[in-house]
């Protein structure tokens, strides 16, 4: 059966239900059975789209299919070619597709063939920062720090799995029952996590954290209310004065964004080595070496861990080592690097407070497999880490530095901290936004001497209350 015959067969139902919908409006009023007709109309439209999509793929030359699967391909040229094939298929079957649906059909076909199907427009929307797919019928986005449910849907689970396969195949991975979890990265740098049944009971789930091409600057973050000018000046002095900094916060709190801002203060004359699971940092300095971990292949071989990268980075004559996130035993190697001449290093950690960050570092060092006494671990942390910056995502979706604390040493077996700056919450205004003020504790940091040794003098009025 030709494409035209298949489309016309499907279109009979489409036209009949349109007429039925119009009749129901005339007979039963504005509501009638129009909703039912609209649903069948949409179902028929999706069936027609699927037929044309299958026809285009079948007719597409094999060499063009191979080019499409390559992330490095010229997307503008591919779009032009696929757009032409879509237009030809519609032109050859003009009675199957109503005129009003043709432009939408071409765009959706291009998204199906070149992009990620129905979620492609969400990925192109600059106001969307995260896309969360909880099965084929439930898709959420994060916009301006708030979660919103969309009316976007996949046709069915098979359609969603087809898009998932496209994502993981592009990075040489697979996802199936034997390997139901995958981390990947899109061509634009966005991070993707996939988990499928039997682990996910609600169906295949995809979480995409979009890669921002517009790097936030200090001025922008001050404008957004993430911190104030005094805190920015202090953090700039800390970076230029080669203090070791840990940025702490929960998931989605803006740790990597803040680390990127802090990294911008590193002098251009220094050699920086960045280590990440998924490359997100966008440093503007010239002398930057970016290293990325590698998961094991299908046979379970070839894995390169963060610990491997930290150890290798120490042999690369770095002036600064910046670890995107410490999660496990690499914390021990990072602390040793901080304690052995690599001052000015920075990393992030998942924790809800500065005190919790210290506990997390202890736990991560224990995960290295080294049987060290707890006091020795705490002593290592106290001598390596100078500043902990705590950032949080608040109820209104805003991200703020809620605390900057200095590690001052040890008293007995306890690592001591002192707060330097903090955010005082004043409540919620009539628009639902959290209000407050950034304040100083009035205490002058003990790291003043270390800063002075590196040519940085803190302004005397920086800590006046």
What are these regions (language model features)?
Residues 276, 281-289, 313-410:
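Conserved P-loop NTPase nucleotide-binding/switch module
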Residues 212-223, 260, 264-311, 357-361:
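P-loop NTPase switch/communication element
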Residues 397-465:
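NTP-binding/hydrolysis catalytic cores, primarily Walker-type P-loop NTPases
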Residues 1-148:
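N-terminal anchoring/assembly modules that precede and organize ATP-driven motor systems
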Residues 255:
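Conserved lysine of the Walker
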Residues 247:
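Hydrophobic anchor at the beta1->P-loop junction of P-loop NTPases
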Residues 65-66, 91-98, 114-125, 167-184, ...:
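Active-site phosphate-binding and catalytic loops of NTP-dependent enzymes
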Residues 125, 133, 138-241:
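P-loop NTP-binding catalytic core
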């Amino acid at each position: 059966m030709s494409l035209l015959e298949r489309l016309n067969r499907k279109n009979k139902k489409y036209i009949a239900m349109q007429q039925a919908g119009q009749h129901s409006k005339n007979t039963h009023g504005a509501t009638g059975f129009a909703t039912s007709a609209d649903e069948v109309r949409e179902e028929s439209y999706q069936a027609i789209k699927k037929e044309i999509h299958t026809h285009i793929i079948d007719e597409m030359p094999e060499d063009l299919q191979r080019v499409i699967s390559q992330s490095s391909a010229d997307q503008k040229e591919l779009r032009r070619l696929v757009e032409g094939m879509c237009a030809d298929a519609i032109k050859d079957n003009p009675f199957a597709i109503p005129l009003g649906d043709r432009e939408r059909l071409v765009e959706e076909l291009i998204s199906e063939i070149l992009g990620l199907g129905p979620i492609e427009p969400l990925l192109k929307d600059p106001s969307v920062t995260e896309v969360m797919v909880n099965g084929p019928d439930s898709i959420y986005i994060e916009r301006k720090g708030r979660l919103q449910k969309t009316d976007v849907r996949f046709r069915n689970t098979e359609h969603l799995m087809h898009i998932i396969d496209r994502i993981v195949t592009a990075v040489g991975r697979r996802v199936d029952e034997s390997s139901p979890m995958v981390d990947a990265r899109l061509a634009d740098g966005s991070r993707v996590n996939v988990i499928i049944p039997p682990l996910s009971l609600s169906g295949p789930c995809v979480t995409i954290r979009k890669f921002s091409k517009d790097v936030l600057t200090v001025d922008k973050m001050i404008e957004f209310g993430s911190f104030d000018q005094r805190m920015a000046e202090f953090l700039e002095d800390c970076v230029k004065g080669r203090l070791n900094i840990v940025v702490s916060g929960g998931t989605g709190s803006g740790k990597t964004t803040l680390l990127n801002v802090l990294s911008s203060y590193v002098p251009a004359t220094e050699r920086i080595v960045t280590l990440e699971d998924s490359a997100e940092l966008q440093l503007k300095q010239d002398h930057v070496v970016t290293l990325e971990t590698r998961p094991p292949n299908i046979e379970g071989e070839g894995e390169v861990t963060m610990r491997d990268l930290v150890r290798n980075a120490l042999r690369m004559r770095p002036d600064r080592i910046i670890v995107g996130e410490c999660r496990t035993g690499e914390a021990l190697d990072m602390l040793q690097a901080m304690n052995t001449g690599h001052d000015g290093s920075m990393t992030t950690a998942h924790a809800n407070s500065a005190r919790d960050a210290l506990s997390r570092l202890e736990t991560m060092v224990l995960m290295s497999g080294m049987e060290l006494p707890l006091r020795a671990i705490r002593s290592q942390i106290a001598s390596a880490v100078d500043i902990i910056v705590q950032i949080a995502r608040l109820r209104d979706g805003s991200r703020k530095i809620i605390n900057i604390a200095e590690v001052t040493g040890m008293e007995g077996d306890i690592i001591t901290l002192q707060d330097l700056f903090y955010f005082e919450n004043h409540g919620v205004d009539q628009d639902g936004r959290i209000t407050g003020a950034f304040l100083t504790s009035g205490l002058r940091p003990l790291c003043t001497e270390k800063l002075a040794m590196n040519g940085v003098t803190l302004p005397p009025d920086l800590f006046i209350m």
